[in-house]
């Protein structure tokens, strides 16, 4: 390191040319160490360069600039030179850098290190050492940091701050190329890694975390080149120039790498030439960052341009390596700046991918901007007071590193927080899109604690060390909350290692986010976080991220994450490149690490998920799995923090354990962590080592993270590429919903991680009991050893223990086997068990009968005694009866008897239950009380009337109403209405029936009480049926009353035995039109009414069912009609449809039959058949009212066939209902249905009536013998010739009447004799292959007849509508054209015509 520092001390060129920036140096990039004077000179050169520069390719050599050479002198000079600038730069770097996402926190560090950058690397090494030594003092420095103080502090930790600054500069200058990334990593390692590492030696826990994180950052191969740029950048760090996303990403990577690389360059240069060339690379980067500086613009949030995933994969591989290396550096306090730098540098080179990932997240927020500011500072040196800014930035970096350590420890898991916050910030900016949105929150939280430090770039290394130490102490469980980062690390390495590396990465991302937030507060925090060891703490934070947003999408586009990874083009991230794992991404990654056990676990986990979906785990089981997974997640994420308290040894052990665990994936920590990190871990063997380190630190982290879970960073979420790989977690939402949702509140990030882990771990439920599993995850994080052991156990369990599905299956098998193992039990034993169970059930049912009876008796007491007492009390107070006793007794009808009955029943039941062991029977009590139970039927029958009486009295009697209201409001009544209690006796009989039925089912057949129970049940059923009938009768009574009230006038509708059956509206066919009529069907009559406008009904007639006939018409045209013939009135009814007509026909017919049967019962000597025959015989002409044929259905006299005209009018025969002319209806006769009243009858009926009259004994005053008073006049008129000439009708036309019943087809059709002839509506009948034409449906003579033989029928097709027209052709000529009402009828008519045309 000394030789390297010496080589680095001589600054050969103020602006080292970024040569080979694009070239990707090997993980330990060996770059020539150009002699660079003071870092300040390169800064000046950088300042001269344009603010924004294309992504310059910085050669590894240039990146290798040694910030170490002038360890303390140059930093002092820089500080002195920059002291004037320090106030400005301090303000900028502290507040502006922190707040301004453009300013690179590493740059603020570099601003302090501007001098440092100009000075040899040794200075950086010293800075790093100071950072390590001064973490505790860092907070004080931050608080006391002022422009003067910043300069002083800058000088105090010149070398370390300068190193940090140089590293930050390198970060800024890092180009997109892997070399730039590596250089950036190297630079980040130097400033951030060394301070963090120095802190790490003091506190292995923090170091482990930060080292993991920083290693991730150092992963970039461009660290060395970015170091150069970063050196220069520090001066501009406070400035917030913006670099292109690619550059910013590269810068972020470089910054992270450079921050780490600076510290690591000093220590690692011997190991990796990159460290040796760290100073040079920084200077070179400064020059190379000239283009970056060109990009140095006020910070503008830019999403990193997506870069090839190859870079991500490489970066991740390196990150894992660095994770391992940081663990070592963390473990080895001896690895001060140089050792840390080497480790970080190697790790960055190895894990450039990882660094890229974390840095990407960090870059997202502002790495590019910080890089640009660094470049500007290097170029201009004036943007932020060079020396002061550099020193201040370094101090801030140191302070931030501790604070970030705290935060890092929280976030380092996901993102290599080891990098200075500035670097993180830059990195964060570049990879904003890559980072999940949730991360910024946590970063903000972590940084929020650090903002004061951030604001003070002047903070000396000791304060930074303080913070680092404090951050060790702080390993905030919130950091765990930033488990997202931790999860990332964990994924990258192994379950645990993967969690570590992923959390480190995510921590970097979070820190980048924090830095963005800190950026606003101040870059110093970034500087503090820049320390590689700060990042591991964030790893512990990952659990928080995982819990809150295991699958939350990141605000940045997935490509942004990709870009971040791509920014480490030199180190393609395997996780990004790798196909996304299944929803078990984390577990899969772990399993990949795990040679054999991983695949089984993955399978088992899928099985577990499937089983959960299909079978549904018990909540406790789910929690168990979750808790175990949480344990692993916490252990892995929390180990770094937990280990830090333990020391380096625990970290080393953690590494070994982590590797083992990683080889054996235990649990997915967070959805993101699991997916990205796991994939990364799968791709890299390095990840296992990284995971091992992280595993060590994870134990501690778990402790701190567990604490943090309830601590600061619960809401933190890592912005990690994991969101980019959300598809891997597609299944997670279900699992998360199942587990995490309940746990989110209490699990925080660690809980999330744990939950995720549990999701992925199938075996955890089996590792520990439900309760233990749930508690263990949270408690295990508390002890690093325990957490590691738990992790190991979990790993073992994952591979060794059966999968959840297997467990479920095994549990099911156990259940089956437990049953099947019993074999076929002994029938006697089974019977005994069954008998015992039945006896127990019988006892419980008997107790239920008794208890329910006790409640019922209390209700009866309330009504019979309490209510009566309330009424009596009110009467005494009033001095007169509130209500008559008669009315009160009616309201409480039969309640006294029921109260006495049930009180005695209860008493006997209680006695039986007391002596149940001696005499197990209660049914005999019901048999004995059975006859009295029929009192319930009486009560039920009077219930409606009694309730109505109660309502009536309440309305009429205000005093009684007040008593009722007061009683109902009393506690005794429980604020229930009195009617509620009056209904209880109605419900009691059905309760008896149910209870006794259940009692009988559970009784043994040989039981003493079996027979009595059957008898008691029969009695109760009889009473229940009677009560039901009574209730139905009550409903029927209500309906009858309603109908009676709806009729206008006074009509006695309510009759004993009358039952309402059906009601509805039918159209009555009057003489000329159809009119609506309302019909009510009873079991003995048909009520025929006319609706009125008032809503009531006018009673037209009540038709008795006796002698009524109902039939449907025979004509095809009247299928909706219904003909009703009764003694009083007969008519034709038309329903709205054939179905409705059929319903009414069935209801009336069945009612007529039932009514006839009832009447026969009163005449036992006659049978039903005889009665029907007698009825046929006894219905002579005139006994029933005929159905009048509507006027429109006849156009001629049905006797003489004379056509009706305006003067020759229609008349109806009152005996047969036919339409006749006046000449044919001149006679009158007394008809029976009219009570002997004379009525017009046709000649045919008159003759028939006379015959009947002669057959019967002569009747006095027989209407047949008497004519009406005007009979003489009428006879005279009839004798006068009417002068009407009767039309002679051929006999052939009279052979068939229109209403014939044996026709082939009949109905109305429209007929036309030609296309231009008008349509006529006529009635047609086809009979005996002859077509008869009638003017109306009831005409007795046809207008014409036409044989159909020799004719043909064709359908006339209509394109626009269904064809309803068909033609009758004779020899091809149209004879007639017919049109039906619908297509169906048309087809039927065509078929009928065709049948008639064929012999």
Curated annotation (Swiss-Prot):
Keywords associated with the record: Cytoplasm, Cytoskeleton, Guanine-nucleotide releasing factor, Metal-binding, Phosphoprotein, Repeat, Zinc, Zinc-finger
Residues given in the record as Zn(2+) 1 binding sites: 1197, 1200, 1221, 1224
Database matches in CDD domains: FYVE_FGD6, PH1_FGD6, PH2_FGD5_FGD6, RhoGEF
Biased composition (Basic and acidic residues): 259-276, 821-838
Sample GO molecular function, one term: zinc ion binding
Bias (Acidic residues): 802-817
Localization: Cytoplasm; Cytoplasm, Cytoskeleton
Zinc finger regions, FYVE-type: 1191-1250
Chain positions with Phosphoserine modification: 494, 531, 583, 670, 697, 1167
GO CC annotation terms, alphabetical: cytoplasm; cytoskeleton
Residue segments, region Disordered: 1-99, 138-164, 185-210, 235-281, 299-341, 367-479, 515-542, 631-650, 657-678, 768-840
Domain of life of the organism encoding this protein: Eukaryota
Record: residues binding Zn(2+) 2: 1213, 1216, 1242, 1245
Every PH domain range: 1059-1153, 1302-1398
Domain DH: 841-1030
Composition-biased stretches (Low complexity): 50-60, 403-418
Predominant subcellular localization, coarse grouping: cytoplasm
Matches recorded under InterPro entries: DBL_dom_sf, DH_dom, FGD6_N_PH, FYVE_RhoGEF_PH, PH-like_dom_sf, PH_domain, Znf_FYVE, Znf_FYVE-rel
Amino acid composition bias (Polar residues), ranges on this chain: 332-341, 377-402, 428-453
General function of this protein: May activate CDC42, a member of the Ras-like family of Rho- and Rac proteins, by exchanging bound GDP for free GTP. May play a role in regulating the actin cytoskeleton and cell shape.
The protein's name: FYVE, RhoGEF and PH domain-containing protein 6
Native species: Mus musculus (Mouse)
Gene designation: Fgd6
């Amino acid at each position: 390191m000394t030789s390297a520092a010496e080589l680095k001390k001589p600054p050969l060129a103020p602006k080292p040319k970024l040569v080979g920036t694009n070239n990707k140096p090997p993980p330990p990039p060996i770059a020539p160490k150009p002699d660079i004077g003071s870092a300040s000179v390169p800064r000046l050169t950088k300042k001269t360069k344009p603010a924004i520069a294309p992504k310059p390719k910085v050669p590894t050599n240039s990146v290798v600039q040694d910030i170490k050479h002038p360890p303390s002198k140059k930093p002092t000079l820089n500080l002195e030179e920059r002291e004037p600038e320090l106030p400005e730069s301090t303000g900028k770097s502290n507040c502006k850098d922190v707040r301004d996402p453009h300013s690179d926190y590493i740059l603020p560090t570099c601003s302090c290190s501007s001098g440092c950058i100009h000075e040899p690397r040794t200075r950086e090494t010293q800075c790093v050492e100071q950072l390590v030594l001064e973490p505790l003092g860092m907070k004080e420095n931050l608080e006391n940091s002022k422009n003067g103080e910043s300069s002083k502090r800058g000088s105090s930790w010149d070398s370390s701050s300068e190193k940090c600054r140089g590293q930050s500069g390198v970060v800024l200058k890092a180009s997109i190329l892997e070399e730039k990334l590596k250089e950036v990593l190297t630079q980040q390692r130097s400033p951030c890694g060394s301070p963090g590492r120095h802190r790490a030696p003091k506190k292995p826990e923090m170091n482990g975390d930060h080292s993991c994180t920083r290693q991730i950052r150092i992963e970039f191969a461009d660290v060395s080149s970015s170091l150069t740029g970063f050196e220069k950048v520090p001066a501009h760090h406070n400035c917030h120039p913006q670099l292109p996303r690619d550059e910013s990403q590269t810068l972020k990577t470089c910054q992270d790498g450079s921050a780490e690389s600076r510290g690591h360059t000093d220590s690692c240069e011997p190991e990796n030439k990159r460290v040796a060339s760290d100073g040079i690379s920084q200077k070179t980067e400064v020059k190379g960052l000239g283009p970056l500086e060109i990009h140095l613009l006020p910070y503008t949030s830019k999403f990193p341009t997506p870069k090839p995933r190859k870079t991500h994969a490489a970066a991740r591989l390196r990150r894992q390596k660095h994770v391992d290396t940081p663990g070592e550096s963390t473990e080895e306090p001896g690895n001060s700046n140089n050792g840390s730098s080497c480790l970080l540098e190697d790790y960055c080179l190895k894990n450039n991918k990882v660094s890229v990932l974390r840095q990407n997240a960090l870059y997202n927020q502002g790495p590019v901007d910080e890089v640009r500011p660094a470049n500007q500072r290097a170029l201009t040196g004036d943007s932020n007071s060079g020396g002061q800014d550099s020193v201040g930035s370094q101090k801030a970096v140191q302070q931030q590193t501790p604070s970030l350590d705290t935060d890092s420890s929280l976030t380092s898991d996901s993102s290599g927080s080891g990098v200075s916050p500035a670097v993180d910030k830059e990195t964060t900016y570049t990879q904003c899109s890559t980072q999940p949105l949730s991360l910024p929150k946590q970063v903000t939280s972590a940084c929020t604690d650090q903002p004061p430090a951030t604001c003070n770039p002047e903070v000396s290394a000791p304060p930074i060390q303080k913070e680092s130490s404090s951050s060790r102490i702080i390993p905030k469980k919130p950091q765990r909350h930033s488990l997202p980062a931790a999860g990332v690390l964990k994924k990258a390495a192994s379950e645990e290692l993967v969690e570590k590396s992923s959390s480190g990465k995510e921590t970097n991302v979070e820190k980048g986010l924090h830095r963005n937030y800190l950026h606003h507060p101040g870059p110093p925090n970034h500087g503090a976080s820049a320390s590689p060891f700060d990042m591991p703490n964030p790893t512990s934070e990952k659990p928080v991220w995982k819990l809150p947003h295991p699958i939350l999408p990141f605000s940045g586009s997935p490509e942004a994450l990709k870009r971040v990874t791509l920014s480490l083009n030199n180190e393609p991230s395997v996780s990004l490149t790798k196909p996304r794992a299944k929803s078990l991404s984390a577990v899969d990654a772990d399993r990949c690490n795990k040679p054999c056990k991983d695949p089984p676990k993955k399978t088992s986990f899928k099985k577990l998920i499937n089983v959960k979906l299909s079978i549904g785990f018990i909540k406790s089981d789910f929690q168990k799995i979750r808790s175990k997974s949480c344990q692993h997640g916490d252990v892995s994420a929390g180990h770094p923090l937990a280990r830090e308290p333990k020391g380096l040894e625990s970290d080393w052990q953690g590494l070994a354990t982590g590797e083992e665990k990683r080889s054996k994936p235990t649990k997915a920590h967070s959805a993101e962590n699991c997916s990205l990190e796991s994939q990364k871990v799968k791709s890299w063997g390095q990840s296992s080592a990284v995971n091992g380190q992280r595993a060590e630190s994870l134990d501690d982290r778990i402790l701190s993270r567990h604490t943090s879970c309830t601590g600061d960073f619960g809401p933190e979420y890592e912005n990690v590429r994991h969101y980019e790989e959300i598809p891997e977690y597609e299944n997670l939402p279900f699992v998360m919903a199942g587990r995490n949702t309940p746990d989110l509140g209490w699990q925080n990030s660690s809980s999330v991680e744990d939950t995720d882990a549990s999701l992925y771990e199938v075996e955890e439920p089996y590792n520990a009991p439900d309760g233990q599993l749930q508690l263990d995850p949270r408690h295990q994080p508390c002890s690093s050893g325990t957490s590691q052991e738990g992790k190991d156990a979990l790993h073992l369990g994952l591979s060794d223990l059966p999968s959840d599905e297997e467990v479920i299956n095994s549990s099911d098998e156990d259940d089956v086997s437990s049953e099947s193992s019993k074999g076929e039990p002994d029938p006697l034993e089974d019977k005994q068990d069954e008998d015992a169970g039945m006896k127990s059930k019988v006892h419980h049912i008997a107790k239920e009968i008794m208890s329910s009876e006790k409640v019922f008796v209390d209700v009866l007491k309330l009504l019979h005694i309490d209510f009566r007492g309330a009424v009596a009390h009110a009467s005494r107070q009033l001095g007169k009866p509130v209500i008559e006793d008669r009315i009160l007794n009616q309201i409480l009808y039969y309640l006294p008897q029921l109260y006495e009955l049930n009180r005695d029943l209860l008493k006997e039941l209680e006695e039986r239950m007391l002596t149940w062991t001696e005499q197990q029977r209660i049914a005999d009590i019901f048999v004995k009380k059975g006859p009295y139970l029929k009192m319930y039927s009486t009560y039920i029958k009077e219930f409606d009337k009694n309730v109505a009486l109660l309502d009536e009295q309440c309305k009429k009697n205000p005093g009684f109403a007040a008593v009722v209201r007061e009683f109902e409001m009393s506690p005794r009544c429980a604020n229930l209405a009195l009617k509620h209690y009056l209904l209880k006796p109605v419900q009691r009989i059905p309760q008896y029936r149910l209870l006794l039925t259940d009692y009988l089912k559970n009784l043994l057949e040989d039981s003493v009480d079996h027979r009595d129970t059957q008898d008691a049940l029969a009695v109760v059923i009889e009473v229940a049926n009677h009560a039901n009938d009574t209730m139905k009768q009550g409903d029927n009574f209500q309906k009858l009353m309603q109908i009676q009230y709806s009729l206008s006038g006074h009509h006695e509708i309510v009759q004993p035995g009358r039952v309402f059956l059906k009601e509805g509206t039918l159209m009555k066919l009057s003489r000329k039109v159809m009119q609506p009529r309302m019909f009510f069907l009873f079991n003995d009559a048909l009520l025929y009414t006319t609706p009125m406008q008032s809503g009531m009904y006018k009673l037209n007639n009540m038709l008795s069912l006796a002698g009524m006939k109902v039939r449907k018409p025979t004509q095809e045209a009247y299928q909706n009609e219904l003909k009703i013939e009764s003694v009083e009135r007969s008519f034709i009814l038309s329903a709205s449809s054939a179905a409705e007509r059929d319903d009414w026909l069935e209801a009336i017919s069945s009612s007529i039959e039932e009514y006839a049967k009832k009447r026969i019962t009163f005449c036992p000597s006659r049978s039903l058949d005889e009665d029907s025959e007698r009825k046929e015989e006894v219905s002579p002409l005139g006994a029933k009212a005929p159905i009048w044929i509507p006027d429109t259905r006849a156009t001629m006299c049905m006797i003489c066939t004379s056509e009706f005209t305006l003067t020759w009018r229609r008349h109806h025969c009152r005996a047969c209902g036919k339409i006749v002319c006046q000449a044919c209806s001149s006679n009158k006769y007394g008809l029976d249905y009219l009570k002997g009243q004379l009525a017009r009858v046709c000649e045919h009926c008159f003759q028939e009536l006379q015959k009947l009259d002669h057959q019967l004994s002569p009747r006095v005053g027989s209407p047949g013998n008497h004519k009406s008073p005007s009979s003489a006049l009428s006879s005279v008129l009839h004798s006068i010739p009417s002068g009407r000439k009767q039309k002679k009708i051929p006999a052939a036309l009279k052979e068939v009447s229109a209403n014939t019943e044996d026709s082939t087809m009949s109905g109305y059709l429209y007929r036309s004799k030609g296309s231009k002839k008008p349509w006529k509506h006529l009635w047609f009948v086809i009979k005996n292959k002859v077509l008869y034409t009638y003017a109306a449906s009831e005409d007795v003579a046809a207008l014409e007849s036409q044989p159909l033989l020799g004719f043909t029928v064709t359908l006339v097709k209509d394109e626009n509508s269904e064809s309803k027209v068909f033609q009758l052709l004779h020899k091809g000529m149209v004879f007639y054209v017919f049109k039906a009402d619908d297509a169906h009828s048309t087809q039927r008519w065509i078929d009928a015509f065709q049948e008639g045309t064929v012999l």
